[in-house]
Amino acid sequence: MNFDYTEEQTLLDNMVTSFVRDNYDWDTRCNIVKSEEGWKEENWKQFAELGLLGVPFDEAYGGLGGKSADLMIVMEQFGKGLVVEPYLPTVILAGGLISKLGSEEQKNSIIPEIISGNIRCAFAYAEPQSRFDLNDVKTSAVLNGDDYVLNGFKSVVFGAGMASHLIISARTEGEQRSESGITLFIVDTKSEGLTLQNYPTVDEYRASEVIIENLKVSKDNVLGKVNMAYDAIEEIVDISTIAACSEAVGILQVLKDSTTEYCKNRKQFGQSIAKNQVIQHRLVDMMIEYEQAKSILYMAVTADLTNSDERRKAVSAAKARIGKAIKFVGESAIQLHGGMGVVDEYMVSHYFKRATMIGVLFGNTDYHMKRYMTLTQSGISSSDESISVSVT
């Protein structure tokens, strides 16, 4: 099994590591999340200069043509620094939809602008009643002449307040939970009929409730084919789930390492608490959970993501297993730090909150375990032996 990075991946890893080290020390991050904007535009410009915004995009549009392993490298390091800029919403989620469904005109006009940092996008798909079901869409789009008129409500749209454009899912035909009949629309966030209510989330990131009232959208702003967006949405959300899992693995490493160091330095009754055998066992269990989380992340990254059956199974297996690791490592870190683990001034509680949020993002452990079991029992996907183990 060869898990070594290629030379290009090593350079990418070193570059992102250097960015986090130089621009995301703890005090700097605290100032960023406490600001009114909740992110730093200078960092976004630096992402563009470093080429990070172009990692997953095709070279034909100015991107680097990176794969899932390259996104894993970026997101894992972002997790270690708790980077709050909207990389996942813009580059991976919305950018992935544009790459997958966009016309040549749309891709040529939007993707280079994302790569240069001039455009930020967010994907508005979740609704109050939908939970994790991507097909549950009540927001409607009715054709009226050359325009569609959209009405509805979208919940917890990450990065919307920082975005210049939204991609909105709406139902153009069919029943509320039908997979067919869902269409995507690209809209400017300043459009009349669109209202954003922005707020900080528990993990200090930013999200928005999006109110859509008689929003007129030209037929030219339809992304992909009318009524046929569901399969692409599921695919890009799966790829985004792997990216979120990568971020979680970076967070778990920080929690594991910082807790081990704290236990070595914390003195009780004249000796380090790390000499206590019960604590040693807990630290070893944290390490095991982290290593298993990283291993199953590699499994998902190296799966054939173009094969929808294999992709679904690999993604749900990884999300369910990493969700379990998040719970154990996160809770253990808080417990072993004692009172220090819950104070806002110390980093551990912030890493725990972000990890917990990732645990429910794109589906929690129970959801993905059920999805995985359904796929397995249905005979969907090939055997585990067909999954490549090479990171490259």
Predicted feature descriptions by range:
Residues 136-138, 156, 188-219:
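Flexible, small-/acidic-enriched active-site or ligand-binding loops
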Residues 51, 74-79, 170, 187-191, ...:
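Short Ser/Thr-interspersed hydrophobic loop/turn segments at strand-loop and sheet-helix junctions
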Residues 100-102, 142, 168-171, 186-188, ...:
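Short beta-strand-to-turn element immediately C-terminal to the catalytic PLP-Schiff-base lysine
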